[in-house]
Amino acid sequence: NAIAEVREAVDFLHYYAGQVRDDFDNETHRPLGPVVWISPWNFPLAIFTGQIAAALAAGNSVLAKPAEQTPLIAAQGVAILLEA
């Protein structure tokens, strides 16, 4: 259901924010560089958001391609992330 999907996306964001706070040291951690994520059609917001959050938390730039069945969900997710 949609509420569970949004909750899972928020959980991913909280998790990776905690990882940055607890485990990354800018003096020793170096980003890998640009990463590409292709998300599946199931869990279109949660998995898409989790992939982006993981890459950004590690300092990488992201090129994310949503599933062809769910482009509007991904577009709205990106808009919300940019607003945040």
Locate predicted features.
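Rossmann-like NAD(P) dinucleotide-binding subdomain of oxidoreductase/dehydrogenase enzymes
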Residues: 3, 7, 12-84
